[in-house]
Amino acid sequence: MKDYRGIIENFFFILDKETQQPAQFRFNKVQSKYYKLLLEEYTDFQGVREIVLKARQEGVSSVVLAMFTVDFLMVPYSVSICISHRKDATELLFKKVKFFLESYCQNKKIPFENLFKTDNKNLIEHATNGAMFYVGTAGAKVGGRGGSASNILFSETAFYMDTAKITASEIVTATAQQVPQDRGMIFIESTGNSTDDYYNAEWERARRGESSYRPRFFGWQEFYDAAWVEKKKKELPNELLARRVYPKDESEAFLAAGSPYFDNLYLAEMLNNRQQPVAIGRLAADGQFT
């Protein structure tokens, strides 16, 4: 089994979130916790099927892309795919992958330009081992549908738009079929959006144990401190959106569709502050409580 973490932390650089300067890739708290969970669930990293709900910018997509990059470097003929919700987000994710590769080449003293047989805005192909890494944008033409893939990351899936040509469900379902059953890695990762979208439905299916994907939730408290989150929330227009972007629990991560009659914030407060019952039982016909 490959030591993904060892390779990533020893050879990959990433742009520091605060300084935007290159720094050695060191797993943060969420990345460390998630990687440990993956090791426990999938000892050989095969048949990985994960749906991740989290607060903003906790590093989940970064660590998944880094793992795919390790496969690009070390697994001959592997095919990794990343699909994001917007063109600009897709481009940024691909730049991150290329930054990993550039730092790896620098550490290994390999000419970066010699690493690729093909290198364009959507696809890179390894010059010697035949591995490929493809990126696409949800709603655009999804490449390689007829072929097979080793790894797929669906990034910010809750924000995939349903169009007349293709729905979010069709994008994920059709593309995921490229990975053979019980093989490879598929991640569906996102912050929450609406209670009536595909991602929410798939999340609820996973929570009920009706999906092949295992649900993981990482709230803001696993990465940020309370003072930082409160300050960040002031940049957002309302409390509901702030809770969706930085949820403390799963219930805060999705906005109810439409305009609910009852205020969700008050309902949540009532639930959290409810009195515990004095006793629990049944009232019989004779008036006895049992």
Predicted region positions:
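Phosphate/NTP-binding elements of NTP-utilizing enzymes
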Residues: 1-290
